[in-house]
Curated annotation (Swiss-Prot):
Name of the molecule in the record: Trigger factor
Keywords associated with the record: Cell cycle, Cell division, Chaperone, Cytoplasm, Isomerase, Rotamase
Cellular component annotations (GO), alphabetically ordered: cytoplasm
Location of the region described as Disordered in the Swiss-Prot/TrEMBL record: 433-469
Keyword Ribonucleoprotein attributed: no
Subcellular location: Cytoplasm
Record bears the keyword Nucleus: no
Role summary: Involved in protein export. Acts as a chaperone by maintaining the newly synthesized protein in an open conformation. Functions as a peptidyl-prolyl cis-trans isomerase.
Gene3D superfamilies attached to this UniProt entry: 3.10.50.40, Trigger factor ribosome-binding domain, Trigger factor, C-terminal domain
Length: 469
């Protein structure tokens, strides 16, 4: 079908949608109908007729005019859409939707008569920034915590400790208690689901169990049985247990403790690739300092981009939101797969729907950040030159092993993404006002509990000591 025969008008719609109204001449409608009859006659099997030799009148009688018209209309719409976007140089990013609905259009479709219909599709948005200069951003500082070095070393000592039986004394903090216990709710006497064990190793450290449990075990002797009263915290994961009082019948069946290795150069050699304890400390200190600096830089950049996003004007198309949500879902699945989980059985249709829905806010935020930076590059004409890209690629290749398999195009794109990101952030740094603020007290406690700095440092450290944290 010739695209020149179409009449096409376009109209922008909210959420980066484009309405494309197409008027198809009667001749094309008739041709589509005749093509549908020919196609169906070749594919249908009717008793007494060879395939492709079914008379027209018999075919219409057997299939009905509606089915033939529907087949013709489907093909007509597909061809008209393809020709219209080519004729008008349109770039949709989603499949089109028929505004009036197929059934309504089918009623008005007559072979040989002109037909007008409107299709809507998502198109790439045009992001704009209200302003680019003079932005104000505030970010949280990240301080190097020297106490983490000692904590990491102590954790490594625990990993390398020898577990030995305890004799002649009661249980105390830091011991490993072998417990048998049974828990019931105080209010109705019902058993606590998952609140019983015949023999379970429990580290006697505060925070390991619900409040009151560890404290109740401290001071017990092997063979002793004791009733301990506890209370579930209000934020306990299991909803029906929150805030409820409980009673546990506890028997201390055995008691063990850890004999930690001496904190000396020999320990450093066994726990890491360092020769001395001093070298181990120095290595951990530097890695934690580097990590704190990286996280502070990340906080600074996040604050600048957040300030830029506030100036962004863009309507996100649904197609991009869905695609970004799928990207996040695939990342989650990949993480689970790396942990050895069976992703196919885990990701049920219901779970996928929930994850897609829950990831939508993050998907939208990521898109806004991306569009804000794209708009900044456009507004301020921030570009890359080939020499800088080539130089960076050579630098990256030097750090890779000789036998590493590299996709040149993917490497170049990754390098370009990093370089343009650096240039955009550098421009924002120079043209914005940035102030520091100390982390909130509660956030500091949460950070200390989660130990993200240590975990990141340990993951990159060559030492076994920090890798075991």
């Amino acid at each position: 079908m010739s695209a020149a025969a179409l009449k096409v008008t376009t109209e922008a719609r909210p959420s980066s949608r484009l309405a494309v109204t197409v008027t198809v001449p009667g001749e094309r409608c008739k041709t589509s109908y005749e093509d549908a009859i020919t196609s169906l006659s070749r594919s249908i099997n009717l008793p007494g007729f060879r395939k492709g030799k079914v008379p027209r009148t018999v075919l219409v009688q057997q299939l009905g005019g509606v089915r033939i018209k529907a087949t013709a209309l489907e093909k007509l719409i597909d061809n008209a859409w393809r020709d219209a976007i080519q004729q008008e140089s349109l770039e949709p990013i989603s499949q089109p939707d028929l505004s009036s609905g197929f059934d309504g259009l089918l009623e008005s479709f007559e072979p040989g008569k002109e037909l007008t219909f409107t299709l809507e599709a998502d198109v790439a948005p045009t992001p704009k920034l209200k302003t680019t200069k003079g932005l104000k951003a505030e970010f949280e500082t990240v301080a190097y915590d020297a106490s983490r070095v000692d904590a990491m070393i102590e954790d490594s000592r625990k990993q390398m400790a020898t577990v030995v039986p305890v004799e002649g004394r009661a249980a105390q903090n830091g011991d490993i208690a072998v417990l048998g216990f049974k828990g019931t709710y105080t209010d109705d006497g019902s058993e606590i689901e998952g609140g019983s064990a015949d023999s379970m190793d429990v580290d006697l450290e505060n925070g390991r169990m619900i409040p009151g449990f560890i404290e109740g075990v401290i001071g017990m002797k092997v063979g002793e049985t004791k009733t301990v009263d506890c209370q579930f915290p209000d934020d306990y994961p299991k909803e029906d247990a929150r805030g409820r009082k409980a009673s546990f019948e506890i028997e201390l069946k055995d008691l063990k403790t850890r004999e930690l290795p001496e904190l000396d150069d020999e320990f450093a050699k066994q726990a890491s690739e360092q020769e001395t304890l001093a070298d181990l400390r120095k290595d951990l200190e530097q890695r934690l300092k580097d990590d704190a600096e990286r996280r502070q830089t990340s906080n600074r950049r996040d604050a600048l981009v957040a300030a830029l996003v506030e100036q962004l004007e863009v309507e996100l198309p649904e197609a991009l939101i869905q695609q970004e949500s799928r990207n996040l879902l695939e990342q989650t699945a990949a993480q689970f797969a790396q942990q050895g989980m069976d992703v196919k059985s885990l990701f049920t249709p219901d779970l996928v729907r929930n994850l897609m829905q829950n990831s939508r806010p993050e998907a939208e935020e990521r898109l806004r950040r991306s569009f804000a930076l794209t708009a900044l590059a456009e507004a301020e004409d921030i570009k890359l030159d080939d020499k800088a890209v080539d130089a960076k690629i050579k630098e990256v290749k030097k750090e890779l092993s000789a036998d590493a398999k590299i996709d040149p195009e993917r490497l170049r794109q990754a390098v370009m993404d990093d370089l343009i990101q650096d240039r955009l952030m550098g421009w924002l740094e120079e043209n914005s006002t940035i102030t520091e603020k100390a982390p909130a007290a509660d956030d500091s406690k949460a950070e200390a509990k989660k130990k993200p700095a240590a975990k990141k440092a340990e993951a990159k450290s060559k030492s076994k000591a920090d890798a075991k944290d």
